[in-house]
Design a protein with these regions (language model features):
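Short, glycine/charged-enriched secondary-structure capping and boundary segments
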Residues: 8-13, 29-32, 62-66, 87-89, ...
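A short, aliphatic-rich alpha-helical micro-motif
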Residues: 8, 41-42, 221, 273
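Inter-motif core of Ras-like GTPase G domains
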Residues: 7-18, 192, 196-202
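Glycine-rich, charged/polar anion/phosphate-binding loops
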Residues: 1, 122, 185-189
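Acidic, Mg2+-coordinating active-site environments of NTP-dependent enzymes
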Residues: 2, 10-175, 302
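Short, charged low-complexity linear motifs
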Residues: 8-22, 275-287
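ATP-dependent carboxylate-amine ligase
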Residues: 140-149, 153-163, 167-313
């Protein structure tokens, strides 16, 4: 929304992390939404950074009206080429902001620096989007002249904000995760992608903001054990489930006060989960149709899970 009205910002470095259908009820179309996001690159002075896996981001960079001397810097999950950041033997490597980058590279961090962000602190369970975000953060920092040791320390010390893939409890070997900030299909797909097949009880739904969630449901179907559906319009989730995951059972929370909704969704999720599973509140939708905010939605979820932990204990 801010980029829509922005005209005079001149960033040192910039990046568009993702583009997925969101806020279409405000922007009117995905094309208009993409055009507003692309403005993040306008007037960039030094580095227009983009994910090599994103054709949309590459197009934004190619078409951006940047300042003279601005370079395109790519992010890769593989060995980086010149003017790229990438991964080599478990290390984040800079081949963009180093002397003689045609033959030199600089390790700026280790993937081990991100282990505390993985479920259970296990590096092998680290969600792929966290690695992508770390590459982006490292590139932005290096563009601003930050030294490698400081990049590494920053990643080690980083603590996610509230309601962002927070494990709030483990009860009877079932992890309960608050990702209430996951209000888009893209965010929820990333949150569920690293889980094993048939191991997730997904709490989903709410105000879809004009987005079609069919592709999301198709993507995450293999990991689902069951779905608890929130929202005034549960069909945003139930109709794609019927089409792409008819084998996955679901329940509908229905209507009530925010506290009643939280109590019901936690009880329904608990009835589905089995030992080793993960119950994750990652709605892919805004909260406004039933809650004051995603914060309230996540807080009430965590409170109900804590109450259940006390009962079980």
């Amino acid at each position: 929304f801010q980029l829509h009205l922005t005209k005079s910002v001149e960033p040192l470095a910039s990046i568009c992390l993702n583009l997925a259908a969101d806020h279409l009820n405000w922007h009117g179309s995905l094309e208009a939404y993409a055009a507003d996001k692309a403005k993040v690159y306008t007037n960039t002075q030094l580095a227009a950074i983009y994910d090599l896996a994103s054709e949309a981001a590459l197009k934004m960079v190619q078409e951006a009206d940047v300042r003279e001397g601005c370079r395109a810097i790519g992010l890769s999950r593989a060995v980086p080429e010149i003017s790229q950041f990438g991964i080599v033997d478990g290390a984040i490597v800079d081949r963009a902001f180093v002397p003689l980058r045609n033959k030199n590279a600089q390790i700026v961090a280790e993937l081990e620096d991100l282990a505390h962000l993985a479920p259970g602190g296990k590096l092998e369970a680290l969600p792929s989007h966290i690695i992508s975000d770390a590459l982006a953060a490292a590139a932005l920092a290096r563009a601003a002249g930050v030294q490698p040791a400081a990049v590494s320390k920053g990643l080690r010390d980083f603590t996610p904000g509230a309601h962002r893939l927070q494990t709030v409890a483990t009860i009877d070997n079932v992890a309960w995760v608050d990702d209430s900030k996951g209000t888009t299909a893209h965010a929820t797909a990333a949150a569920l992608a690293s889980h094993a097949p048939n191991s997730v009880v997904w709490i989903a739904g709410g105000d879809a903001k004009g987005a079609d969630l069919s592709e999301l449901v198709r993507q995450v179907a293999p990991v689902l054990r069951g779905v608890v559906v929130l929202g005034v319009h549960p069909e945003f989730i139930t109709e794609p489930l019927a089409k792409y995951a008819p084998q996955v059972p679901y329940t509908i929370v229905g209507q009530g006060s925010p506290a009643e909704l939280a109590k019901t969704m936690v009880a329904q999720a608990a009835s589905m989960a089995q030992s080793g599973d993960c119950v994750i509140l990652s709605p892919a939708c805004a909260s406004w149709d039933q809650f004051v905010s995603y914060n309230q939605r996540g807080d009430l979820f965590a409170q109900e899970v804590a109450a259940r932990a006390g009962q079980v204990g």
